[in-house]
Amino acid sequence: MELIIGIIVIYASVLILLFIFQRSLMYHPQENNYFGDKLEVEIEKVKIKTSDDIDLLGWFHKKDLKKFKTIVYFHGNAGNLENRTYKLNHFKDMDVNFLIIAWRGFSGNLGKPTEKGLYNDAKSAIIWLKEL
């Protein structure tokens, strides 16, 4: 019986620790796997304001908004914009526009990443594009 209680206590403790530290386990804004790739496409650094008044850093590559589709690129849960340089370079020979944004808490942006906040960031990026 003591063994079963011990296992339950350990299991509950692990669950509590996972709950407490879930944000730091899910989001890694300080991770840097940047290898020094040079950006081979011309970008404009943009600021996108969210509805909760956070400025997000973004990179916008515009060829022709009327003629070509626009890709909105959300970089994931780790690192910063520079970590995606090698991926963005694949767009250089494509007839597309693209916008990549850094989430709140990433690439020097204020705020902390949360699910609700990330949805807000994504909506703000799309609204910004529609207003061009």
Predicted regions and their residues:
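Short, Lys/Arg-enriched, disordered terminal segments
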Residues: 1-4, 65
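Membrane-embedded segments
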Residues: 51-132
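An N-terminal hydrophobic leader/cap segment in hydrolases
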Residues: 3-49
